[in-house]
């Protein structure tokens, strides 16, 4: 029945109804010149060639030829929505950030959800981490929290980032997804065990974007009005309840409704079923960080909720769909270096790398003036600096104000109260190898204590079902890493691989051994 159609399916109909009795606008060129005919090109005679003076055609085609912008290297497929963040608990003892300044304060936000490895046209229901990035339009500039639906990540050293992403993408010759690439990297870098185990658990395929938690993942630093700092992690827990999709259903949806998650989010908001999340922090003092048994800045590990309990802060609600996807989602750009006073980076190596990488890729993808785009603009504060010109400068370029600093003409000046907090660092500069920094203990806890028996069985089945596509020597190396976590983990996956491999003999390959991290070596250090 037509009356049963989803709001997303009826978007065009609803747009027309929203105009009421308004007459159609006059069709124009990009320069605003009215157009008399949009169906027929201007030619010399009914069968003749086109005329160069047909500016209706050239204006249309020239713009069409330039519609596409570079696709995001990662997080290419996504959905977005707007809403607000509301403070429900006072945390001013930890942070002076105005976004937290009093209970009841609300701040506009925009959120982008995404898959990670797939291209813009890939299915929503693949086994993949989900991006969960939040932009807060605060009184003191934008705060971008670039999170995921997982509290950990695959690597802890940012220098590995390009190679890790390459391993998850397509083979450079065949242009196919390659299990050898994926598992070769993971098995050579056993710090990935924690995230890989989470990925192949039930939570590896969340039911849309509304039924999953989010995490800032990185370690950050909060500073209060007295200049006292603490380290923190950010968590946002779904108020819709955790729901995941079984493998068979995910495969079916990938074929029949590849945009399942985008559709689900859009329709929920359009129907007034606004999704929300409760926002928490974990706090660790500098003294606790010095004495903690693990590196508190290691992105492959979590902070124990028993030692560092969740502290409620607020909630955020998504209550508006984008008016235009390209303008408000495709051009949406998150930068973890956007931190208002009271929120600062920690020594987290992955965060440090992303402070450069994220804005750098936005300048490539959107241009030097991407922060002038309405969705990225810090519209709740006044931007005043000495940056000028560049492609697509869309405002007054700061008029006649001086474009150099310092100057004697009352142009923007610094305010010492906004100086970053002091911090101590090691004087010993080197390339520190952290490959064997206990890659197994927290994974063992996840396998034996977080998961129940049915979940452990599904984890092993999911992992073996993907690992079977890799070469035998890669399978063997990965199982050795799992054995270092727990013998039951390794034995289960090996038994399933033996069954898969018996069904089709693998090609034998000869390889040269390479130096790499070893989960077994890490276990032996415990």
Curated annotation (Swiss-Prot):
One of its GO terms (biological process) is response to copper ion. Heme binds at residue 358. The gene is cat. Belongs to the catalase family. Residues 1-29 are annotated as: Disordered. It comes from Danio rerio. GO terms for molecular function: catalase activity; heme binding; metal ion binding. Catalyzes the degradation of hydrogen peroxide (H(2)O(2)) generated by peroxisomal oxidases to water and oxygen, thereby protecting cells from the toxic effects of hydrogen peroxide. Its cofactor is heme; NADP(+). The lineage of its organism: Eukaryota, Metazoa, Chordata, Craniata, Vertebrata. NADP(+) binds at residues 194, 201, 203, 213, 237, 303, 305-306. This is Catalase. CDD domains: catalase_clade_3. It is found in: Peroxisome matrix. It is an enzyme of class 1 (oxidoreductase). Its main location: other. Its EC number is 1.11.1.6. Gene3D superfamilies: Catalase core domain. Keywords: Heme, Hydrogen peroxide, Iron, Metal-binding, NADP, Oxidoreductase, Peroxidase, Peroxisome. Residues 1-22 have a biased composition (Basic and acidic residues). InterPro entries: Catalase, Catalase_3, Catalase_AS, Catalase_clade1/3, Catalase_core, Catalase_haem_BS, Catalase_immune_responsive, Catalase_sf. One of its GO terms (cellular component) is cytoplasm. The active site is at residues 75, 148. Homotetramer. It catalyses: 2 H2O2 = O2 + 2 H2O. It comes from the Eukaryota.
